């Protein structure tokens, strides 16, 4: 790629990585990037009215596709506006790359117009955050950022001064295969699976608490609940992955949850936490044994005292666990929890609109409508333009 610019290396690398669009607001420090996109024509620039929206849009794309999404902001307040959306992306563990343009490199550290220190500001909401100071540095930093975002599931930030983006570069992007990472599957240790099976086989009433980490594990979860005759409670982050087509689900718990979810956790002998960092300590049972499975070791025991903690992918863990469980026939506890759930839902199922295209804003059923819309993906501009209290009416 002789006689090309650093910005061209950026856009070519993103193209090789499979990026189809970049969300952002144009600015002079981003001119190199946007001009390169214009000349290429194979990556769309999605212009938004505020950089915060760009970060949230990239997060939504990454969440729905599971693939890398990209947003960009110009120097100073431009990229600072990304931060709220990037925190959401990072906490939701979706792969997002943020390109933060910076002031001219010769002016860094001299109190220049709109100068900030983005390498410090974005550190808390990213797995990777680095400043590019030279054309030679760019390829390695950008490739590392992409691998961090995809492999670690979260945000990576690359900071590029506007003048650096316009410099010439002879660098070549990495081959696509080296960046096309798939999320790793963490297999639990065999000894941990044996210990968990022993704990569950020796337990009476078991409840499953499921979170965002149960993505892709719906069918194994249902099989586990059937084997244990256990009710499934879901945290808000697990709602879309757990609740649908699930005869064992007894509702969401938490500050906006059902009493049935709280009841199922409070009255169990053993609580099995699967892929959740459910934050509300007051909702955990005081006397039950608690086991936790999570791919992130730092989550283990962070919210409640554990009798057993293990690192593993939820689906892989259930697959290894099921053959070791004793078959159960007693449904008394499960049926009691399901009855409580039906009682808690009385009157609610009649509230959602009969039509998928009906507005939710005249009904007090926003969570139900929102969950259904996410599954059907039937969004429209007019739908999202309305406020929760109803459509905005402008008097003549």
From Swiss-Prot:
Pfam families according to UniProt: TPP_enzyme_M, TPP_enzyme_N
InterPro entries: DHS-like_NAD/FAD-binding_dom (IPR029035), POXB-like (IPR047211), THDP-binding (IPR029061), Thiamin_PyroP_enz_cen_dom (IPR012000), Thiamin_PyroP_enz_TPP-bd_dom (IPR012001), TPP_PYR_POXB-like (IPR047210)
Example GO molecular function: thiamine pyrophosphate binding
Name of the molecule in the record: Uncharacterized 42.6 kDa protein in isoamylase 3'region
